[in-house]
């Protein structure tokens, strides 16, 4: 008689995804980041739930309620630090996961990839509205600057901004609705994650050499369950070390000052994980261009599968495109650095060059390199 895990209507779904799932035998640690993202999401939802029990979404008490959590609630300081730094780890894992997808050609699973890009946008939205909640100076001014970009939408821009604000400026109504969105969005992310996995399990995982691995599959459990558990241990250790030893390392000191609409901070900037997009945004002098560049800096990922020209899937045996991939990584680091710098020479021109290179790599240089590599293969 077949075991319960193979016959029970609910358990057999989990069994198919976590126990008997056929997985390529040669997938490296770069394939760990998917499960790490699941762990990050669960950690963020749990810590966020406990924070929401003590937080008040009113401009007169929001800042002091966060201070109250850190000072008076049992282990509130730990929950808050884990949640704030957990967001940083979430984005580290996302960027690693996307980089793995780009390097090994996982984007050729188009449905899985496109749902992943939507997931990235949703997580970015969640992080943005979450950053507003402590109601510090950078929370307030960050919300003001970014929401104001919608005024560039033709005809209905100003109306759209006031609709999102719930008034004529970022105020109590804005904070209340941002809290509602920040509570709701992670559950939408969780639902989309299930869809992401559903489409992934239609095709199975890609692997480092980019060839069909049907002839050499192993079961997910115990091989990859234990491999994932090791990843969990490493990430949780790193997260707790950051949250316990230097919890404010990645934050902005400006956010320890309560929001004041009458005093503008000398340098408005988002959290480190948005700095690359912020640098692209700032490199364009036109407001509508800024909105389009900001959106396209992420949506360009959706175009990648359409621009795949190479006969090979991954970059394992493609040195020219490998060089371009690492150029992209370096470019992202430069953009992140520029996003945190003041708007003055030479940072303006460096940001503009890095922004042009960012889009050129995706839209022109990588497709050209793939075509060139096909030609060199014919000569060999």
Swiss-Prot record:
Do the record's keywords include Mitochondrion?
yes
Please give the InterPro entries that the UniProt record associates with this protein: Cyt_b/b6_C (IPR005798), Cyt_b/b6_C_sf (IPR036150), Cyt_b/b6_N (IPR005797), Cytb/b6-like_sf (IPR027387), Cytochrome_b (IPR030689), Cytochrome_b_C_euk/bac (IPR048260), Cytochrome_b_N_euk/bac (IPR048259), Di-haem_cyt_TM (IPR016174)
Keyword flag Membrane? yes
Q: Which residues bind heme b b566?
A: 97, 196
A single Gene Ontology biological process assigned to it is: mitochondrial electron transport, ubiquinol to cytochrome c
Q: Where, subcellularly, is it found?
A: Mitochondrion inner membrane
Name residues in a coiled coil.
Answer: none
Q: What Gene Ontology molecular function terms does this protein carry?
A: metal ion binding; ubiquinol-cytochrome-c reductase activity
Gene Ontology cellular component annotations, sorted alphabetically:
mitochondrial inner membrane; respiratory chain complex III
> What is the required cofactor set for this protein?
heme b
Write out the entry's keywords from A to Z: Electron transport, Heme, Iron, Membrane, Metal-binding, Mitochondrion, Mitochondrion inner membrane, Respiratory chain, Transmembrane, Transmembrane helix, Transport, Ubiquinone
UniProt membrane topology term: Multi-pass membrane protein
TM stretches of this protein? 33-53, 77-98, 113-133, 178-198, 226-246, 288-308, 320-340, 347-367
Cofactor binding note from Swiss-Prot or TrEMBL: Binds 2 heme b groups non-covalently.
User: Quaternary form?
Assistant: The cytochrome bc1 complex contains 3 respiratory subunits (MT-CYB, CYC1 and UQCRFS1), 2 core proteins (UQCRC1 and UQCRC2) and probably 6 low-molecular weight proteins.
Q: What else is known?
A: Heme 1 (or BL or b562) is low-potential and absorbs at about 562 nm, and heme 2 (or BH or b566) is high-potential and absorbs at about 566 nm.
The task this protein performs is described as: Component of the ubiquinol-cytochrome c reductase complex (complex III or cytochrome b-c1 complex) that is part of the mitochondrial respiratory chain. The b-c1 complex mediates electron transfer from ubiquinol to cytochrome c. Contributes to the generation of a proton gradient across the mitochondrial membrane that is then used for ATP synthesis.
Q: Which family does it belong to?
A: Belongs to the cytochrome b family.
Protein name according to UniProt: Cytochrome b
Protein source organism: Pethia conchonius
Gene this protein is translated from? mt-cyb
């Amino acid at each position: 008689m077949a075991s319960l895990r193979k016959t029970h209507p609910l358990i057999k779904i989990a069994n198919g995804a976590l126990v008997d799932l056929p997985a390529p035998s040669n997938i490296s640690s770069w394939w760990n980041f998917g499960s790490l993202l699941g762990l990050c999401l669960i950690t963020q939802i749990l810590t966020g739930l406990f924070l929401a029990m003590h937080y008040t979404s009113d401009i007169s008490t929001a800042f002091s309620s966060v201070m109250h959590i850190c000072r008076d609630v049992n282990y509130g300081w730990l929950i808050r630090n884990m949640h704030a730094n957990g967001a940083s780890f979430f984005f580290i894992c996302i960027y690693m996961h996307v980089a793995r997808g780009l390097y090994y050609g996982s984007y050729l699973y188009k449905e899985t990839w496109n749902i992943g890009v939507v997931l990235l946008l949703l997580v970015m939205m969640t992080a943005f509205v979450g950053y507003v909640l402590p109601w510090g100076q950078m929370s307030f001014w960050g919300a003001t600057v970014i929401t104001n970009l919608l005024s560039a939408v033709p005809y209905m821009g100003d109306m759209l901004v006031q609709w999102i604000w719930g008034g004529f400026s970022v105020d109590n109504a804005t904070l209340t609705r941002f809290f509602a969105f920040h509570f709701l969005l992670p559950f939408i992310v969780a639902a989309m994650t299930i869809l992401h996995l559903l489409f992934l399990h239609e095709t199975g995982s890609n692997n480092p050499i980019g060839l069909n691995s049907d002839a050499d599959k192993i079961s997910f459990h115990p091989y990859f369950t234990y491999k994932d558990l090791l990843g969990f241990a490493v990430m949780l250790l790193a997260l707790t070390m950051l949250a316990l030893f230097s919890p404010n390392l990645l934050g902005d000191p400006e956010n320890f000052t309560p929001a004041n609409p009458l005093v503008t901070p000398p340098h408005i900037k988002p959290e480190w994980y948005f700095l690359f997009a912020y640098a692209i945004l700032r490199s364009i002098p036109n407001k509508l261009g800024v909105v389009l560049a900001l959106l396209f800096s992420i949506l360009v990922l959706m175009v990648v599968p359409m621009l795949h020209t190479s006969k090979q899937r991954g970059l394992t045996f493609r040195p020219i495109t490998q060089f371009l991939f690492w150029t992209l990584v370096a470019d992202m680091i430069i953009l992140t650095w520029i996003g945190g710098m003041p708007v003055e020479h030479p940072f303006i021109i460096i940001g503009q060059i890095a922004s042009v290179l960012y889009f050129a790599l995706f839209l022109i240089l990588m497709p050209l390199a793939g075509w060139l590599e096909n030609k060199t293969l014919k000569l060999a």
